[in-house]
Amino acid sequence: MDQSREAMAWYSHRSCPQAVASNLRRLVVDDYGPAMHAPERLTVYVDGFNLDHGLKERSGRRLLWLDLVKLSRLLRPRSSLLRVHYFTAPVLDDPPAASRQGRYQSALVARNPGLVEITQGRYQKKTRTCRACGASWIQYEEKETDVNIATALVADAASCATDAALIVSADSDLSPAIRTARSLNTTMFLAAAFPPMRYSAELSKLMPASFSIGMSKLTGAQLPRTVVDPASGRAYSRPAKWM
C-alpha cells in the first residue's frame, strides 16, 4: 500500500458516525481561533516474538537494537502516542542471549521513560523425538504472548483507553481478540503493521488498514549505539553480536 492510500485507510474511520461523535467530544479550542481536533491517541501492541523472527529472517541481527517508540512515531506521525506495549518472553538456557535481551529492554525503557510497558510471557521446554531415527532434542515454545496481547487489547477497548490500536504482528491467532475489541468499542480504529517476512491474509482482511513495515523505517528507528539512563546514569551498549 503506498503512503497516500495508507493514510486514507488510517483516517477514513473519521467518517463513521460513532467516530465523529467521539471526535466532537475531543475538540480542542485554542486562544487563536476555532476548535481543532485533538491528535488521535495511539497505543501500539508489539508481538516481540513475531517481530524478532521477521527481523532475523530479513537482516540477521543488525536491526534488533530497535527503538519501538521511534518506530511507532515514524509509522503514525500524526497520532499522539500514549505508549508502546511490548510483549516478549525471557530467554531460557542461554545466559549470553538472556543478557543481550535484558540489555535491550533496559535500553528501550531508559530511552523512552514512561512510554514503554513490557509484559513477559514464557518459553516452555519440550523434548522432541525423531520417529525415524530415535534421536531427541530440546525445543523451546513461546507461550502466552498472544493471550497477553489479546487481554491488553480487549481491556483497552472496553475502557476506551485509546482511540487507535496499531498491532505489530502477523499472528492470525489475534483475530478473535480484534473482533471482540471492535465490538466493544466501535470508535476505536485498529490497524496491523506486519514485520518483515511476515504477512497474514486473515488480519489484512479483518482490519480497516494493514501494511508491511518498510526497511527505511526500521533502519531509521535504531537506538543510539549506547543509551544512558537519565535517572540512574547507567549505560547500555548495543551487543557486539547485533552489529
Label for each model-derived stretch:
Residues 2-3, 38, 235:
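Intrinsically disordered, low-complexity regions enriched in Ser/Pro/Gly/Gln/His and often acidic
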Residues 3, 27-28, 143:
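Exposed, low-complexity/repetitive linear segments and helix-based recognition motifs
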Residues 6, 18, 26-27, 34, ...:
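Residue-level marker of intrinsically disordered, low-complexity segments enriched
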Residues 9-139, 189-191:
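Domain-level signal for Mg2+-assisted phosphodiester chemistry and nucleotide/NA-binding surfaces
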Residues 117-243:
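Nuclease catalytic cores that cleave nucleic-acid phosphodiester bonds
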